[in-house]
């Protein structure tokens, strides 16, 4: 009886794992970004070698030449 239960448990686990792997393929096609799909349209190529740059470079708005922080004497 124990061997029958072990065999039944192994068969059920194989069936469950097979169904989970089958569902992974469907999720790839639910992507909203067309560039991330398997057959991307032209112009969506990524450049993995391109270094990242910050979106907004920090700038105080003044340089030492403009003397923006200078306090004027009355």
Swiss-Prot record:
GO terms for cellular component: apoplast. Its main location: secreted. The gene is RALFL25. It holds the Pfam family RALF. Disulfide bonds join 35-44, 62-68. Residues 1-22 form the signal peptide. The lineage of its organism: Eukaryota, Viridiplantae, Streptophyta, Embryophyta, Tracheophyta. Belongs to the plant rapid alkalinization factor (RALF) family. It comes from Arabidopsis thaliana. Keywords: Disulfide bond, Hormone, Secreted, Signal. This is Protein RALF-like 25.
